[in-house]
């Protein structure tokens, strides 16, 4: 039995524990040390006094000593949290947080104070690297006040102080050029980039790469997409040539024994000749090392080149603009926040401070704007301090993609919502009854609520959705339903299936576990309005803690073995318990869980098959929607359509609500395999409309072609439902259909005949299709069919 991964539920599994873990440290810190929470009047007076003392110290000195004080008391502390570095990053696909307890304390000075002293250092201080740092901090202060033009004037004056041939002058020019690009001032950016590339700058590959990156952005913004692609490609090639040369020189300098000497010779020939079948290990490592970008400059060039190539393939040669505001729900603007417009290829990794292709701060009114954006699919991410997000949430969803088309002028306003308050069970309440009464704050305009639970035990957490589409703000859940929870997740201890975390297997059936819960609120369109889990960091926002203990049962001897992570012994103990009492549904459930976990790790097909009769018995004792769907999915994999249809129909009865988009997609494929093309196509549409990632679009396109739809119509569907799969290779189905159209023009009758044959093999689930794909020779049709086989 295969482990099913539903995209949206996977995200809940990954992100929900993260969010709760973020809340908990802050909550516990508040409980342990309330004195560090909201500033009292005495604390405010202390800060005010310290500010006055610092101002007096700065104002009472002059000359070099004054500049030294500005550097040590303002510029250097400002580096503790540089621009675009925040406590919390929130996005559609992921969230992250950090808190460095060793950070310098925040500046005592007000923004106006910092502006004055930073400007003085930039215009009168020593010409050193601290001048560049001060210039960046000064530009930031002007930007967040909404007076970026004043910052540009100061930068211009600073550049005039410095030799035009110095690297420092060039860095300042590139900084100013990037600011002009971000502001949409192409003319100013062009002049600044020309100045930055004036003769005399040699041996500065990092600055050369940055100049190429900015210049390519400018060319695209001006409408010269082909010129931008050529420039960034040349810049990348030049950068990599210098990089490779440095590695070759480094290897040559490592001379020693004969093996090192041979490594050096091979390394010198790495770029231009064929490497022998068994190269030295050091050369293998170097080869692998050079395949990946090894600096932010190289990564930015690669990213831009790929974005421009994708835009060119789609015929998108004109830039776009996206702007908006970031506010709280009461209308208060959120200033000094980071806004990151991240392309689809980049959203699977954490935000890279200061190196994202499109990043900007919100000004005093919460405004932000991106100009010269390359068309494509993007997601917005926010950078916030703990203070900014404390008690609030951004109700963003996994599939919140922004499609940016040529010449678009889009507006995307972001509104933070107050966190939902939980009522019961809370604050580590111990429950011993037959049900759990969940209750939470009612939310205006809420159409439904989703209840999720998290199991915390032995240093690990495991989360899942308990109930969806709840219409009121309270619900009673039988403990037996909670006991049905569980799956398995791994820990760092142990090897193979013995590394499965006990808490993930026992779930809510562990009376020693501490459990927590959360609520998400949805409107009538299925959009998230707000949620309960988030950042609560002080006594005004902490509210009730979402923890409780469920002690309605005691651990069995077999359970104790699971707790001790003696899983082989536990497996036999549960087998013995079930043999002694065929009505022992807990022993049977745990037996199925353990066997499934072991089969998954060992790839033992016979063990997998052996779980099915037990799962059949389990659904007789505990007929839950998830258990029944697991059976349906098993028979789907076996192409046993009679059994599949039986269990899928039963699943729909037990679910009592519309199925998840994943379930609909699987059922659509099953219907297609059974020759029910019309119903399959209808189910595909229902799945795709619910799933913003469009996971099953490839199968839907195959079904449409099998139904005799022309390639032109199928192309429109591919464009309507583009696949999104961050973190893995995304298939451009529209491109594949376009290539098939071009291939068909040569011999349309032959193409149509072969397409029909391959689709018949596909819908019959015939192994001959894979044999045909594995044959020599490439074609657009073969590429398409290969991609279709990978859907699911």
Regions found by a protein language model. Give the residues of each.
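Long, contiguous interaction/recruitment modules in multidomain scaffold/adaptor proteins
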Residues: 2-41, 413-559, 563-575, 579
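Alpha-helical repeat scaffolds
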Residues: 69-73, 111-122, 149-161, 187-198, ...
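Short, ordered, surface-exposed loop/turn motifs in non-cytosolic proteins
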Residues: 189, 322, 328-349, 447
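Structured interaction patches on ligand/partner-binding surfaces of diverse proteins
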Residues: 237, 283-295, 385-411
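Beta-strand-rich domain onsets/edges
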Residues: 287-321, 327-332
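A short, amphipathic beta-strand motif
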Residues: 320-328, 366, 414, 558
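Short, acidic Ser/Thr/Gly-rich low-complexity loop/linker segments typical of extracellular
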Residues: 347-367
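A short, solvent-exposed beta-strand micro-motif common in secreted/extracellular proteins
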Residues: 366-367, 374-389
């Amino acid at each position: 039995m295969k482990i099913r991964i539903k995209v949206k539920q996977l995200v809940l599994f990954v992100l929900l524990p993260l969010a709760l873990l973020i809340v908990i440290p802050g909550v516990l810190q508040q409980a342990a040390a309330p004195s560090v929470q909201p500033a009292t009047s005495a604390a405010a007076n202390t800060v005010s006094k310290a500010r006055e003392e610092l101002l007096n110290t700065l104002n009472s000195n002059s000359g070099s000593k004054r500049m030294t004080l500005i550097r040590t008391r303002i510029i250097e502390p400002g580096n503790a949290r540089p621009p675009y570095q925040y406590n919390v990053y929130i996005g559609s696909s992921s969230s992250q947080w950090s808190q460095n307890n060793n950070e310098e304390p925040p500046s005592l000075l007000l923004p106006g104070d910092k502006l004055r002293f930073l400007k003085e250092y930039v215009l009168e201080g020593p010409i050193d690297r601290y001048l560049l740092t001060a210039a960046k901090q000064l530009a930031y202060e002007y930007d967040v006040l909404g007076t970026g033009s004043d910052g540009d004037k100061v930068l211009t004056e600073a550049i005039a102080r410095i030799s035009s041939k110095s690297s420092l002058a060039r860095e300042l020019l590139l900084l100013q050029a990037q600011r002009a690009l971000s502001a949409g001032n192409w003319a100013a950016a062009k002049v600044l980039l020309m100045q930055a590339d004036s003769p005399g700058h040699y041996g500065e590959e990092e600055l050369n790469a940055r100049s190429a990156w900015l210049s390519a952005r400018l060319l695209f913004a001006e409408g010269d997409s082909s010129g931008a692609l050529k420039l960034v490609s040349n810049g990348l090639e030049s950068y990599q040539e210098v990089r490779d040369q440095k590695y070759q020189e480094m290897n040559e300098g490592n001379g020693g024994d004969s093996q090192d000497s041979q490594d050096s010779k091979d390394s010198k020939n790495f770029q231009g000749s064929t490497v022998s079948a068994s190269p030295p290990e050091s050369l293998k490592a170097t080869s692998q090392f050079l395949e990946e970008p090894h600096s932010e400059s190289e990564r930015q060039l690669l990213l831009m080149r790929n974005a421009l190539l994708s835009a060119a393939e789609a015929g998108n040669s004109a830039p776009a603009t996206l702007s908006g505001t970031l506010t709280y729900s009461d209308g208060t603007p959120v200033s000094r926040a980071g806004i990151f417009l991240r392309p689809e290829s980049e959203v699977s990794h954490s935000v890279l401070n200061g190196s994202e292709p499109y990043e900007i701060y919100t000004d005093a009114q919460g405004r932000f704007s991106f100009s010269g954006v390359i068309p494509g699919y993007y997601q917005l991410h926010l950078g916030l301090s703990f203070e900014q997000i404390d008690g609030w949430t951004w109700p963003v969803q996994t599939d919140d993609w922004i499609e940016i088309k040529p010449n678009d002028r889009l507006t995307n306003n972001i509104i933070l919502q107050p966190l939902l308050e939980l009522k019961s069970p809370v604050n580590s309440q111990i429950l011993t009854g037959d049900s759990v009464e969940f209750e939470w704050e009612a939310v205006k305009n809420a159409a439904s609520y989703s209840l999720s639970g998290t199991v915390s035990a032995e240093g690990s957490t495991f989360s899942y959705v308990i109930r969806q589409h709840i219409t009121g703000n309270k619900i009673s859940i039988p403990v037996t339903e909670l006991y049905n929870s569980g799956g398995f997740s791994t820990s760092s201890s142990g090897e193979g299936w013995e590394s499965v975390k006990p808490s993930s297997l026992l779930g809510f059936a562990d009376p020693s576990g501490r459990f927590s819960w959360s609520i998400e609120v949805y409107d009538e369109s299925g959009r998230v309005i707000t949620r309960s889990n988030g950042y609560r960091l002080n006594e005004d926002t902490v509210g009730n803690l979402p923890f409780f203990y469920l002690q309605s049962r005691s651990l069995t001897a077999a359970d104790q073995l699971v707790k001790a992570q003696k899983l082989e012994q536990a497996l036999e103990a549960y087998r013995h318990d079930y043999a002694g009492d065929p009505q022992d549904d807990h022993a049977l459930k745990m037996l199925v869980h353990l066997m499934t976990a072991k089969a998954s790790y060992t790839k033992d097909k016979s063990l997998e098959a052996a779980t099915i009769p037990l799962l059949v018995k389990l659904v007789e004792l505990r007929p839950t929607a998830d258990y029944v769907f697991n059976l349906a999915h098993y028979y789907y994999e076996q192409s046993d359509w009679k059994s599949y249809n039986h269990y899928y129909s039963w699943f729909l009865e037990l679910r009592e609500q519309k199925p998840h988009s994943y379930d609909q997609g699987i059922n659509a494929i099953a219907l297609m395999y059974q020759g029910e093309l019309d119903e399959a196509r209808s189910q595909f549409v229902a799945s795709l409309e619910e799933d913003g990632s469009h996971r099953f679009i490839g199968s839907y396109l195959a079904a449409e072609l099998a139904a005799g739809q022309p390639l032109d119509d199928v192309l429109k569907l591919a464009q309507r439902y583009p696949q999104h799969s961050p973190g893995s290779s995304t298939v451009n189905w529209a491109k594949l259909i376009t290539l098939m159209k071009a291939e068909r023009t040569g011999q349309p009758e032959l193409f149509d005949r072969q397409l029909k044959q391959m689709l018949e093999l596909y819908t019959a689930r015939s192994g001959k299709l894979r044999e045909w794909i594995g044959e020599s020779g490439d074609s657009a049709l073969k590429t398409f069919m290969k991609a279709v086989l990978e859907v699911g």
